[in-house]
């Protein structure tokens, strides 16, 4: 997962963000350690980098009206701009990610990280892992695949008769070939009789020339009559087919639902949703600023506090904040209990998360509205095509109906002509003695040749149908392959959620086992996660709901093992479990494919040696691992890791 050679060094430029006036930092692939004391704006740098990646955790410096962060990475520049107007902070720019929710939860592992805190506070771990999965999209994909499978199966059902159709056509082909062979034999026999009859009437035929001419005209007229009859029948069949097609087209046109989307209303709604999203962006940014500010106050990071309140920098405010159970409210200036501020901060954080969820829901609604608009436009295009096709078909019907009338008139004319020629031939036959039989033989020959031509045409049509049938066999094979693929995709979609939860459990358990071995917590035998189904109440009914259950197995001094709870672990142990849980989410959601950074902060509760082991272990996954550490903790890390020192005596560029 860590592909350090895939990207060049990253450069971060910051202006008026958090507690930072201006700074430039280069990050090489691998581990970068931000070393410095508390209140030296290391966390502000991490939040600025988060903001460049698309997070809402970024905040504007308290005494500035504008701020920015730029991230240069792999030949491209990503920006985040913050501006304050009438007390409202708005954001703009082109960050690395359009939606950084997954990275916020599993890659940006600051002290307030939701995955870390969920373990420490014993919150719903299943929801932490799975709430970012768009289950609505999965359900929509399942419905789409089911619909496609139904279409494929209907098409396959329509092709079920292919084998029977082929046998029928092959039988018809054999019959026609046999019929052609019989007609050719009959034609040969008649021609032989005509030749013999010609020899018997070679002499004394005064009217032979005239009779021959009449016979020729009669043969031609009969041939024309049969051709006209055949064309007339074909035209009638074509008209009938066109009428059926017209009826089908009209039914298809009538079956179009009335336009389900009012385009004007949908367009207005789209603009309204976009406007609401922009408003939420500002609100979330403001809430994040307040949450971050109060967190920094509670954590004793006085650099930002002093900068915002205009402190003289002598350190006394920091000492008071850290040492006291109360702190100065930054809104009214009175002394307030820290627990009260924590409670208010938790409520603000909940409001911020609600706004984020509302924004995510609005983004989904926006996508659905845009899809509906496109579908409505496509339906309108389809209707226009059907109307055009229906008009062309009506024109063709009119043309063929006129052709039928012309052919009917022509048939009547030819029938009268044949009757007249037969009468003339009969009269001449009486004058030419034995030539009556010859006339009859010519008539029979004409009928046989006409039948032979017709049968050959029928055979050619059968061959064409067999060729078309071969194409339909190819289509059936393709549809069968598509059905198999759709079934596989459908099964994958149906099992995706369960697969994700199973992968999360497996990843956490494997990583936890590895980390416990690395860190050497002697009194912890095992920490493992289990997926369980529990009946919970939702409204008035109880439903089965998946949950993650965290198990902690300890060993006593006597060697006995027993299961314990998370609240009995030391702060160091709880932080390690929280970090490993976040890492499991990072791996399961493949966050390394979305963003190349992993950020680490607020690990002071863990001793230096174990911090070094954690950094060494986490370093294998992201391209860039940026860790904010105290100087004494940073000393335990590998000397090859790049250090960036933070403090009041350091120049703005690094």
UniProtKB/Swiss-Prot annotation:
GO terms under biological process: double-strand break repair
Keywords recorded for this protein, A-Z: Cell shape, Coiled coil
Domain of life according to the entry: Archaea
Phenotype of gene-disrupted mutants: The deletion mutant forms only disks across all growth phases and is non-motile.
Coiled coil: 135-290, 341-503
Gene Ontology MF: a single term: ATP hydrolysis activity
Pfam families linked to this entry: AAA_23 (PF13476)
SUPFAM superfamilies: P-loop containing nucleoside triphosphate hydrolases
Alphabetical list of InterPro entries matching this protein: P-loop_NTPase, Rad50/SbcC_AAA
Similarity field: Belongs to the Sph1/Sph2 family.
Function in brief: Involved in cell-shape determination. Required for the formation of rods and wild-type-like motility.
Protein's name according to its UniProt entry: Smc-like protein Sph3
Organism: Haloferax volcanii (strain ATCC 29605 / DSM 3757 / JCM 8879 / NBRC 14742 / NCIMB 2012 / VKM B-1768 / DS2)
